[in-house]
Structures are given as structure tokens and as C-alpha cells.
């Protein structure tokens, strides 16, 4: 972040605005709404400022700027139409370590004013850091249509009731859950929208007697990597969580969307390297839920497709813990789509099979005869370290050596890299790849040249030469 968003209390604080035109008027309006003690310095004044001065809403000084005007001031805004004057004001204010904003010149300002959606006491601020003010304005206009006017009343009445809630619910996480439940069902907002304040207060009171001490677990699929592929429900639960247990494949960009105060616990697993044993993960889910916490078990892709989700839920059922499951976009769907490879196609594949290259025990055998059948697409999760076995078994069971193969590395992310070759060279294709890699085997891979649409930031989308992969 170039700027840290901070809401500052300006009530009765002395503020100076230099400039008396329309731009200055807009800044002064905001300062007055926040209760600031405003002095305006200019050689000429907009008529509205003269009227406000006559009404004792602000003070005006009909003079040029001098550095003495900065004495005892807390905040300064330079809004003249003269660049040299504005720069002089900024330099003088910086020397006195005052907060200063120069309109239209973020580079010499110590703070900037965001676009604002005002539903006081609820206020939303949007800023592009001065880089795209029109974009920030358009976002504000969009939010204005989404946030109803009665949100201010909702926040105000909640503030009046906070002390009562603290008296009844002593534990902070349970208080948060009370408010989430109250705000989440929409009943309170509907009553206030209709002006039924007494009924709204009654609802808040009766809701205090409901049992909110029981924790629960949400098994959430985080998708294949791109944060924008998260479902709305997944994001909602991540924002409500007390504890999040996440896997190795969940990216930092997705973890950044979790509620700031939530505890983040890595229970990541890689083949042959279990950071936390599965049994311990199951135990933690039960323990945290019994403590009354809202627990999110965050897994890459979809929890029910090679994600051990079923094993974890069986443990919760035995312990009597309430749970819900939120599906995610599985790697096969996400990575194939971003690589331009349809998993089925009437001309090439009438079926698709998902298998994992990381099985529970080494002795488990796949039905290689069925997997080697033509006119189907085979998708292998976590198959990179088993490339030699997969190649050998498919070839020995009759799959053609020239069968197209794609390896989608770090799919759907800005680091996505797709390597395409033939089944006969599968072992060599993955030689230079590290990180999560999905294997797609079948004639549909030939469509990637035509249908590939996603150009990642860091690498070319397609490579057909293993040597190039090793150089990447």
C-alpha cells in the first residue's frame, strides 16, 4: 500500500484551507462535516464561503498566505490555482510536521482525501492513491447504489445497544457472532428501513437469549489459485472465521482475504512431507469448535476432490460438531480452462477421468487398462513425481505414444506455465517444473494452441520444448 487508510477525529481541531474557489469549497465542506474549526485564507472568496463566515461556521482571512498562519494548526489544505503558492504551503507545513494536502499534487502531500460514501456513522473511503481518481469516483458511485441509506441508522442503534450486549455476553468472540447473526439475517435492517425502531430494539433484545456458544466448522474450497475464483460464500465465511486451518496450496493472496483478527494455522501437506499429520488436523477442528469458535478448513481446489474432506467430516460427525461444505473450483476445471483445454469435446473425448498420483499407500493400483482407453481425457492430480510410472503404465496398456499431454504448472495464477508434449516424453516434460502441477492427457490438449486465452504476467502460456522449461 502506498497509503495507510486512517480515519482521524477533527472535531474542534484548527484547520487551515488556503484558497477560496470551488475546489476549496468542496474540501471545506468535508472538514465542516467532521466538526473541524476551519480558517480560510484567500484574496477572493466564493459567495458561499462569505455566507458561511457570516453564520460563524468558519473564519476567513482576506490575505495572501504567510507561514505565520500555520501556527497552532493541525491540518492544512492547499487549494489555490497557483502551483508555486501550493508548493510553498506544502514545504512550510512539512517543516512544521503538519498534515498537508495539496489538491491535485499527491506527490507533495502528506495525506490525500479519498472518495467517500457517507452513511454516518458508517463511512466508506475509496482511494487510488491519486493515480486514478476517476476510477475511485466510479467505484464510489457504484457503492452509493449498493449501500442503502438506512445503514447509518443501523450503525447508530447498534452503538446504543453495545453496552447491553457486553453485559449479557462476556466473551468477545461470542459477541462478534451475535452481531454477525443479527446483521446477517436482514431482519433488523428491514425493520429500520420501515422506521420501526422499537421493534428493531426488541429484536436485538430477544436475540441475546439465543444460544451462540456452539462452534462449527466450514469446509471451504479455495479454488485453484486465482483469488477471483473464490465463491461468494467462501469469502463470506473467511471473513467471519475465528480460526482458519489452511493447506499448502492456498496462496497468500487468498489468505489476505481472511478476517484480519482470525488465527491462521498452516496444516500444509506435500508428498512425503506432512507439516501437520492428518489426525492432528482432525483433532484441531474438533477442539476449536468445542471452544465455541467459527472454524474454516480452507483447502485448495475443491475439498471433496482429492482433498481428504470426507475424512475430516467423518471426524466431526463422530464428535457431534456442526459443519457445512462450500465447494470450490477444482484444479481440473480451473487449470484446464485457463490453459484453453476443454476436458470433453464431441470430436475428441466423450468422458473425463480424474485420478491422483499421490495415493494413500504405495501398494494401491489404478485400473490402468481403463485409464489407457482412447476417446477420453485423463486428468492426474499431484502426478508430477509419478510421471515415469504414469508414462510406462499407459503405454504398456495400449495408449498411443503420440497422445498429447499438457502439464499446467501453478494454474490460474500469474505464474501459470503450460508445457505441451506427447505421452512418450512425459517424464522429460516435467523435469524443470516445481510447485503444483496438473497433468492432462488426451487429444483435447491439441486445442490449446487455438483456445489458449490466459496470458500470465511472468511466463509465456505455452511451451512445447522441455529445454525451454528448464531455462524458465
Curated annotation (Swiss-Prot):
S-adenosyl-L-methionine binds at residues 224, 300-302, 305, 330-331, 382, 411. The active site is at 247 (proton acceptor), 269 (proton donor). PROSITE patterns: SUMT_1 (PS00839), SUMT_2 (PS00840). The modification Phosphoserine is found at residue 128. It catalyses: uroporphyrinogen III + 2 S-adenosyl-L-methionine = precorrin-2 + 2 S-adenosyl-L-homocysteine + H(+); precorrin-2 + NAD(+) = sirohydrochlorin + NADH + 2 H(+); siroheme + 2 H(+) = sirohydrochlorin + Fe(2+). Residues 215-472 are annotated as: Uroporphyrinogen-III C-methyltransferase. InterPro entries: 4pyrrol_Mease (IPR000878), 4pyrrol_Methylase_sf (IPR035996), 4pyrrole_Mease_sub1 (IPR014777), 4pyrrole_Mease_sub2 (IPR014776), CobA/CysG_C (IPR006366), NAD(P)-bd_dom_sf (IPR036291), Siro_Cobalamin_biosynth (IPR050161), Sirohaem_synt_dimer_dom_sf (IPR037115). Keywords: Cobalamin biosynthesis, Lyase, Methyltransferase, Multifunctional enzyme, NAD, Oxidoreductase, Phosphoprotein, Porphyrin biosynthesis, S-adenosyl-L-methionine, Transferase. It comes from Psychromonas ingrahamii (strain DSM 17664 / CCUG 51855 / 37). In the N-terminal section; belongs to the precorrin-2 dehydrogenase / sirohydrochlorin ferrochelatase family. In the C-terminal section; belongs to the precorrin methyltransferase family. Pfam families: CysG_dimeriser, NAD_binding_7, Sirohm_synth_M, TP_methylase. NAD(+) binds at residues 22-23, 43-44. Gene3D superfamilies: Cobalt-precorrin-4 Transmethylase, Domain 1, Methyltransferase, Cobalt-precorrin-4 Transmethylase, Domain 2, NAD(P)-binding Rossmann-like Domain, Sirohaem synthase, dimerisation domain, Siroheme synthase, domain 2. One of its GO terms (biological process) is methylation. Then it catalyzes the NAD-dependent ring dehydrogenation of precorrin-2 to yield sirohydrochlorin. Finally, it catalyzes the ferrochelation of sirohydrochlorin to yield siroheme. Its EC number is 2.1.1.107, 1.3.1.76, 4.99.1.4. This is Siroheme synthase. GO terms for molecular function: NAD binding; precorrin-2 dehydrogenase activity; sirohydrochlorin ferrochelatase activity; uroporphyrin-III C-methyltransferase activity. Residues 1-204 are annotated as: Precorrin-2 dehydrogenase /sirohydrochlorin ferrochelatase. Pathway: Cofactor biosynthesis; adenosylcobalamin biosynthesis; precorrin-2 from uroporphyrinogen III: step 1/1; Cofactor biosynthesis; adenosylcobalamin biosynthesis; sirohydrochlorin from precorrin-2: step 1/1; Porphyrin-containing compound metabolism; siroheme biosynthesis; precorrin-2 from uroporphyrinogen III: step 1/1; Porphyrin-containing compound metabolism; siroheme biosynthesis; siroheme from sirohydrochlorin: step 1/1. SUPFAM superfamilies: NAD(P)-binding Rossmann-fold domains (SSF51735), Siroheme synthase middle domains-like (SSF75615), Tetrapyrrole methylase (SSF53790). Signal peptide: none annotated.
Amino acid at each position: 500500500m502506498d497509503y495507510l487508510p486512517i480515519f482521524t477525529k477533527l472535531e474542534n481541531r484548527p484547520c487551515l484551507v488556503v484558497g477560496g474557489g470551488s475546489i476549496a469549497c468542496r474540501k471545506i465542506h468535508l472538514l465542516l462535516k467532521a466538526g473541524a474549526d476551519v480558517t480560510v485564507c484567500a484574496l477572493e472568496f466564493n459567495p458561499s464561503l462569505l455566507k458561511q463566515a457570516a453564520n460563524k461556521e468558519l473564519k476567513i482571512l482576506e490575505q495572501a498566505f504567510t507561514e505565520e498562519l500555520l501556527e497552532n494548526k493541525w491540518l492544512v489544505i492547499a487549494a489555490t490555482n497557483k502551483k508555486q503558492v501550493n508548493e510553498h504551503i506544502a514545504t512550510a507545513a512539512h517543516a512544521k510536521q503538519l498534515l498537508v494536502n495539496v489538491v491535485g499534487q499527491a506527490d507533495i502531500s502528506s495525506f490525500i482525501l479519498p472518495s467517500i460514501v457517507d452513511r454516518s456513522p458508517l463511512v466508506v473511503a475509496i482511494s487510488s492513491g491519486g493515480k486514478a481518481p476517476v476510477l475511485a469516483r466510479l467505484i464510489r458511485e457504484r457503492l452509493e447504489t449498493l449501500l442503502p441509506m438506512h445503514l447509518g441508522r443501523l450503525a447508530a442503534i447498534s452503538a446504543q445497544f453495545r453496552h447491553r450486549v457486553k453485559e449479557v455476553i462476556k466473551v468477545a468472540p461470542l459477541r462478534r457472532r451475535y452481531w454477525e447473526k443479527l446483521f446477517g439475517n436482514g431482519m433488523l435492517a428491514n425493520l429500520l428501513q420501515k422506521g420501526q425502531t422499537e421493534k428493531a430494539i426488541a429484536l436485538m433484545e430477544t436475540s441475546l437469549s439465543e444460544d451462540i456458544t456452539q462452534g462449527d466448522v466450514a469446509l471451504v474450497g479455495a479454488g485453484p489459485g486465482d483469488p477471483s475464483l473464490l465463491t461468494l460464500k467462501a469469502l463470506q465465511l473467511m471473513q467471519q472465521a475465528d480460526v482458519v486451518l489452511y493447506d499448502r496450496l492456498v496462496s497468500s493472496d487468498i489468505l489476505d482475504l481472511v478476517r484480519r483478527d482470525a488465527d491462521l494455522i498452516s496444516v500444509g501437506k506435500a508428498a512425503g512431507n506432512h507439516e501437520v499429520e492428518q489426525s492432528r488436523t482432525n483433532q484441531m477442528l474438533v477442539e476449536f469448535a468445542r471452544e465455541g469458535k467459527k472454524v474454516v478448513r480452507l483447502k485448495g481446489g475443491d475439498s471433496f476432490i482429492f482433498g481428504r474432506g470426507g475424512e475430516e467430516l467423518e471426524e466431526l460427525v463422530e464428535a457431534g460438531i456442526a459443519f457445512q461444505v462450500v465447494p470450490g473450483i477444482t484444479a481440473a476445471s480451473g487449470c484446464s480452462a485457463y490453459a484453453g483445454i476443454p476436458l470433453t469435446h464431441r470430436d475428441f473425448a466423450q468422458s473425463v477421468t480424474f485420478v491422483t498420483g499421490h495415493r494413500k499407500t504405495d501398494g494401491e493400483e489404478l485400473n490402468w487398462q481403463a485409464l489407457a482407453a482412447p476417446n477420453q481425457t485423463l486428468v492426474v492430480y499431484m502426478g508430477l513425481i509419478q510421471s515415469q510410472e504414469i508414462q510406462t503404465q499407459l503405454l504398456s496398456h495400449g495408449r498411443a505414444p503420440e497422445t498429447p499431454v499438457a502439464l499446467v504448472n501453478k494454474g490460474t495464477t500469474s505464474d501459470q506455465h503450460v508445457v505441451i508434449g506427447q505421452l512418450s516424453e512425459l517424464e522429460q516434460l516435467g523435469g524443470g517444473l516445481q510447485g503444483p502441477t496438473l497433468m492432462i492427457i488426451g487429444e483435447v490438449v491439441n486445442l490449446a494452441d487455438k483456445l489458449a486465452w490466459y496470458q500470465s504476467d511472468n511466463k509465456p502460456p505455452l511451451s512445447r520444448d522441455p529445454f525451454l522449461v528448464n531455462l524458465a
